[in-house]
Regions:
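Phosphate-binding chemistry for phosphorylated carbohydrates and sugar-nucleotides
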Residues: 1-7, 31, 40-41, 53-55, ...
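Non-catalytic, regulatory and substrate/membrane-recognition segments associated with hydrolase enzymes
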Residues: 87
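Hydrophobic or amphipathic alpha-helical targeting/insertion segments
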Residues: 19-30
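Glycine-rich phosphate/diphosphate-binding loops that line cofactor/substrate pockets in enzymes
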Residues: 9-17, 60-84, 153-166
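A charged helix-plus-loop insertion that forms the helical arch/lid used to bind
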Residues: 37-50
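Short, flexible active-site-proximal loops enriched in glycine and acidic residues
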Residues: 19, 78-80, 113-117
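Glycine-rich phosphate-binding loop of ATP-grasp-fold ATP-dependent ligases
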Residues: 34
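Short, flexible, solvent-exposed loop/turn segments with mixed acidic/basic and small polar residues
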Residues: 25-26, 77, 275-277
Length: 345
């Protein structure tokens, strides 16, 4: 962790931007821990700097200074440039001490820092992006984060054609992690008519133990600690709340997972319909990994006529195949364009 603090300072100096460090092991067991570095626009760390991170982490103690010099020279880092690093952590017992080690690494190289304390990983990504865009993306505070998301949700909800209490209730498995703390806070920003019920909220039970998004995805069944009735809307976070998965049980008790393949298919179909409506010839494509459901691939290619591209397994490969600055920018750019062209009916 100390060394990742050092690396974050070098990356900040090289990019002349704020860099984020998140202490978390995501969907892994509570006793594990790890670190994620966040690049200037809230995106994942550049692949070349992942290599630097690996080299630095594995360097012998007596070779540490030489490793830092080598990275600085290879990446053309101006060591006289100011550096600023923002830090967040999840709720694991070890996270606070480890984040202190990150801070030690930042300060030993003369970097400045802001410790946000307990955050979800998406919240830290947001903070980094806000700080590096002069506030254009939003206010780099927890309140700013909640306000931005809740405002967008309220506006989107106005266009939804749903009715009845069943459509206003969501049960959330928080994996006994940071997602519970932050969702409790965010509930105050959401409409009163929306019922968000929290389960596995950290008051008892261990992080990611028989619960959480990875458990649900891997075992294809509901998490422990949540009671599901037929057709109730349910979802699960992972340990640092940067992963979410939706599911429900039908009237016969069969479990149904609304996974990424299904969501990607729905979104691409929706965007394609909008493009056809305004007569645009833009092409919408979908990127999948080798673990993708083969039926979804065939449906997209053969029925929807949407091109599908395959990349290596892992979110970083899905991220870096996109020729835009940060995750979701391709989608958001298209959506913004469509919103300007189409008035919702």
């Amino acid at each position: 962790m100390f060394r990742m603090g050092l690396l974050a300072v070098l990356r900040s100096k090289q990019t002349k931007s704020t860099i984020g460090v998140m202490v978390t092991a995501s969907h892994n067991p509570e006793d594990d821990n790890g670190v994620k570095l966040v690049d200037p626009l809230g995106e994942m760390l550049a692949p070349s700097w992942e290599e630097h991170a690996t080299h630095l982490a594995n360097a012998e103690e007596q070779d540490l200074a030489r490793a830092l010099v080598a990275i600085s020279e290879e990446a053309a880092v101006n060591l006289h440039q100011d550096a600023f690093v923002v830090i967040g952590r999840d709720t694991r017992p070890s996270s606070e001490k480890l984040s202190e080690s990150v801070i030690d690494g930042v300060t030993v190289l003369g970097g400045q820092f802001h410790d946000y304390g307990l955050l979800t990983t998406p919240q830290l990504h947001y903070m980094v992006c806000c700080r590096n865009t002069g506030g254009q993306y939003g206010e780099a505070t927890i309140d700013g984060y909640y306000h931005k998301l809740s405002t967008a949700f309220v506006e989107l909800s106005k266009q939804a054609s749903c009715s009845g209490d069943d459509y206003r209730t969501l049960k959330v498995d928080c994996a006994n992690g940071i997602g519970a703390l932050k969702l409790k806070e965010m509930k105050h920003y959401l409409p009163q008519g929306l019922s968000v019920q929290l389960f596995n909220d950290g008051t008892k039970g261990k992080l990611n133990h028989f619960c959480g998004a990875d458990f649900v995805k891997s075992h294809q069944k509901p998490p422990e600690g949540i009671e599901m009735k037929a057709n109730e809307r349910c979802c699960s976070f992972d340990g640092d709340a940067d992963r979410i998965i939706y599911y429900y049980c039908d009237v016969d008790g069969h479990f149904h997972l609304i996974d990424g393949d299904k969501i990607a298919t729905l979104i691409s179909s929706f965007l394609k319909e909008l493009l056809l409506e305004i007569g645009e010839s833009l092409t919408v494509g979908v990127v999948q990994t080798a673990y993708a459901n083969g039926s979804s691939t065939r449906y997209l290619e053969e029925v929807m006529k949407v091109p599908v591209y395959c990349t290596k397994t892992g979110v970083k490969h899905l991220h870096h195949i996109e020729p835009f600055p940060f995750p979701g920018s391709l989608l958001s750019s298209i959506v913004r364009y469509l919103c300007e062209e189409i008035t919702p009916s």
